[in-house]
Amino acid sequence: MRVSEWERVLYRAIVAAGLKPIPQFSIEQYDLDFALVEGNRKLAIEVDGERYHRSWTGELCLRDQLRNQRLIELGWDVQRFWVYEVRDELQRCVRLVQDWIDNKRTDAV
């Protein structure tokens, strides 16, 4: 599995924030860009690249929707970021991941 530069950028930023993402996590037939596991809660983090998603067809859109739906059925939350979000708003992306952790901790209390 090829890792994009923007996946590396987001990974480093999430790690720098004190979180422990698992890169290239496999679940069923899917390879997640990252996974965060917090107790019994699981977050799939995906970086949607410009090249891959530049010319969305109905097939690509449907495939990602089915993937998200299956992950949710398996008990995962899904957070997707576009490359431009990682590039232009990196700290906001990290904050969204941290908010997920904080919200899930609150839910568990």
What label would you give each PLM region?
Residues 1-109:
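Nucleic-acid endo/exonuclease domains
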